[in-house]
Amino acid sequence: MHSLINKIQSKIKSNIFLDYDMRKSTWFRAGGNALGYVIVNSISDLKTIISYSDQIKYYIVGVGSNLMVRDGGFEGLIIKLGKNFNKIKINKDTLSVGAGVLDVNLAKFALQNSIKDFEFFSGIPGTIGGAIKMNAGCYGSQTADNLKRILVINKLGKIKYLTKDELELKYRSSNLTDELIVLKADFSCKYSSASEIIEKKNYIKLKRESSQPIKEKTSGSTFKNPPGEYAAALIEKAGCKGMKNGDASVSIIHSNFII
């Protein structure tokens, strides 16, 4: 398989790291090696890599904040979107955001440009691509709220737009398969005063500081809330708050966080 990866490397400009220790790129700092790890800096390179999908598996990652790698590692290529997918642009009433942009950086950009309703992203670890796939959200807001459409590429190298309705966005879910890679997203722009945006952002910050283990690197809430219930409350009722197994434990601050 290394010979195949070397063949792919010869056709792209982005560097592939062989036998990559995934502990370096996940917040849990656990798991085995991937056959290869590449930070892709162009659509051209991305197309080349996925053109070999019938010969080698691939998996797209963001910053590894919501990723657990098994001890046996991953028998394929881990792909991370690089700097050319980390751009944010404003075009009239549309905010175009690269899939590799950090959620927190989108929140900062929105504040700097007096664009409201992106404050909740300041409390979500991860990238916009991942936020779209799981319809990430918190404190009454979610990624779907202002989303208009996304640009994706499939394993055949075809690029197309998908509208918000086509994604069937629901509570922490979408119909996006692993076969589709999100390249960018277009959001609606709604303007407000900086003071109003800062007030909402500070409210979210205070809520997080008072109820979440923010001093630890976590993947956020681990389990979805079932209808009419809170996962954290159910975990506490089961007597699992503070439970430990090796170096992992259920947070005593918020039972739905694993640290």
Language-model regions: role of each:
Residues 27-35, 72-74, 79, 129, ...:
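Short capping/connector residues at structural and topological boundaries
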Residues 90-94, 98-104, 117, 123, ...:
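Contiguous, small/hydrophobic- and glycine-enriched helical/loop subdomains that border
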